[in-house]
């Protein structure tokens, strides 16, 4: 892969394929990227020999396109994962040592990689927010706009009207 501004998205799509999301639709849902971006990235990954596209017969004779990662793609993904884990460990170390300026510089340089680090499970959102708070840094300056799930899922909090009656169970009004 070539170092470009699209590289984090390329790695995210490659990681999704490695996790078993083998169609463009599944990748779009899993990554939060647009269908257009996913289609372009898939073509780029095919050109680099990191994935292959196979057509299969689907339900009722419809053709189904499946994507699989190649050995070269697996090696590339392992290398990227190792690099990102090293960078994450460095940021954790800087935060623990209280080196605010170095942490800030490192965090800004990694801003576009945060979504992929979250997607791959390298970093944890709660840990990241805690580190930013420890350094007294504004969270919005270090969070890219396209982080899937960064908006905070409130779950059932929007329903309102629910009271807890202790031993009598929950009553919704």
Regions found by a protein language model. Give the residues of each.
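Short, amphipathic alpha-helical interaction segments positioned at domain boundaries
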Residues: 64-107
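Short helix-to-turn junction characteristic of helix-turn-helix DNA-binding domains
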Residues: 14-20
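Exposed, interaction-prone assembly regions rather than primary DNA-binding/catalytic cores
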Residues: 90-168
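Short acidic, hydrophobic short linear motifs in intrinsically disordered regions
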Residues: 21-30
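Short, Lys/Arg-rich nucleic-acid/phosphate-binding segment
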Residues: 56-64
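Short alpha-helical segments that sit at the start of domains
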Residues: 1-12
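Long low-complexity, intrinsically disordered regions
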Residues: 171-173
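Short amphipathic alpha-helical interaction segments
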Residues: 30-48, 53
